[in-house]
Amino acid sequence: MKDFVRLQSSFLLCTILTLSEQESVSVGCTSSMFWVVAEPTLLGQDHILHSDEASLGTGCPVTNVTAKGYEFNYPATQCGIQKEVFSYVTVFYSALHCNIMHKGVTGKIPLMCIVYGSSLDTTSSTIHNNLTEFQNDPPATNSYSPWNLTNASLFGLTRIPYFQNSSVEASHQSLLLNMSHPLVHESANVAIF
């Protein structure tokens, strides 16, 4: 009976996240930093996620609570963040873990961020959509457009969230589709940071 209740709660959580069309998670990175901002209403307006119920990667806690949500700001070498380096592209992979303590429900939202550049410097990167440069810190809230998370993936499903922005050029949207990685799925859209 206990397993049935957990399964039912897991299905409800998955349904809420799948149907949610709000901007719930923003992801950013440089060649040395990785950050995520998750809204407390990630699970829907009726299910508030508390800061101690979310973690990044291998259990890294929220680093800051702001009006926009819970911030995770870590060096790209921590929290089990995975990195793949290609000729002019570095791809970072991680996951946002949700553990709804009072309901016994856990979930995982895969995250991905791409850094373009000819070298792996550790000081700065450029955000593609407005060419704003920054030094090892997430950009100010007014300096970039947040990326939408419109299809969340939970419980190891083979679908990654859509990080889509109208400024993403068509030639870059399918870049990772030719690369093998367990988080890449044929219908994935990739945001350019």
From Swiss-Prot:
N-terminal signal peptide: 1-22
Chain coiled-coil ranges: none
A single GO cellular-component term on record: extracellular region
Residues carrying covalently attached carbohydrate according to the record: 64, 130, 148, 151, 165, 178
Subcellular location(s) of the protein: Secreted
Principal location: secreted
Keyword terms, alphabetized: Glycoprotein, Secreted, Signal
Presence of the UniProt keyword Secreted in the record: yes
Family matches, as PANTHER family: OOCYTE-SECRETED PROTEIN 3 (PTHR14380:SF10), PLACENTA-SPECIFIC PROTEIN 1 (PTHR14380)
Family: Belongs to the PLAC1 family.
Protein name: Oocyte-secreted protein 3
Annotated source species: Homo sapiens
